[in-house]
Design a protein with these regions (language model features):
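Non-catalytic accessory regions of SAM-dependent methyltransferases
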Residues: 1-125, 132, 193
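Structural motif
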Residues: 42-43, 136-137, 164-167
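A short, sequence-level motif marking secondary-structure junctions
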Residues: 57-62, 144, 210-215
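Short amphipathic alpha-helical segments
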Residues: 78-85, 145-153
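Non-catalytic substrate-recognition/targeting regions of SAM-dependent transferases
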Residues: 109-116, 120-127, 147-217
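A short interface-forming secondary-structure element
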Residues: 125, 134-147
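General beta-strand recognition
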Residues: 129, 136-138, 206
Length: 217
């Protein structure tokens, strides 16, 4: 297990709820080289007095050195935690997706707000699969924290939504800053069509939901 020691006085923002630990706040990182070089590996975060502060995902390639998973010492970061976080996020928003216009792009997971650092998920096509395609989930894995747990995240999304189509969209600038490869691909089922009509308020706009590009009309 990696151990991140925070510089004296730099723990205050963490204790106030800041989910990011910047490289400038890190005094040292202890652990095997293969773990230190694995983006997203779980680390124990401690104060300079060696007091437990958090469990976080460590990324040596980013200026955001660690992203907090939990402040509870008795809460392990494992498949069960990932499943619970995805379930809780979807429980807050699935009803909204089910009642939304099938052509609306509805946010289902909101990164740190849902305890899933860097993960954004939007649903299109209705939770019940308008158009016979089963709808689409478009995911952005914008941090090593969730990149590390991609497989169980996708499994949980498939199970909880019943949506068969999951597509990974990449933000190049964000993933470059995390030292992650840029990927755009279907993770399950079918890739969304290049051009779909997406409702924004009262208007329908032609959009490529794989990239967020809005076509000129």
């Amino acid at each position: 297990m990696l151990i991140i020691t925070i510089k004296q006085g730099k723990e205050h923002s963490l204790l106030k709820g800041d989910p990011w630990i910047y490289l400038s706040a890190v005094e040292k990182v202890e652990g095997r080289p293969q773990e230190r070089n694995k983006p997203g590996a779980t680390a124990i975060v401690q104060s300079s007095a060696r007091r437990f502060l958090a469990r976080a995902a460590y990324n040596a390639k980013s200026q955001i050195a660690a992203r907090v998973w939990t402040l509870r010492e008795d809460e392990p970061v494992d498949h069960a935690l990932i499943k619970r976080r995805v379930q809780a996020a979807l429980a807050r928003r699935l009803d909204a997706w089910r009642s939304a216009d099938p052509q609306a792009l509805v946010q289902l997971v909101d990164a740190e707000q849902d305890g899933l650092p860097g993960l954004l998920v939007h649903g299109y096509g209705g939770a019940d699969g308008e158009g016979g395609q089963g709808g689409y989930l478009v995911c952005q894995f914008n941090a090593a924290a969730v990149e590390f747990w991609k497989v169980p995240i996708v499994q949980a999304l498939l199970r909880e939504t019943g949506c068969p189509n999951v597509y990974e969209r990449s933000d190049k600038l964000v993933r470059d800053a995390e030292g992650l490869f840029v990927k755009a691909r279907a993770l399950a089922g079918e890739e969304p069509p290049q051009r779909l009509m997406v409702r924004e308020g009262e208007r329908l706009k032609p959009m490529d939901i794989r990239t967020g590009f809005t076509y000129p009309r």
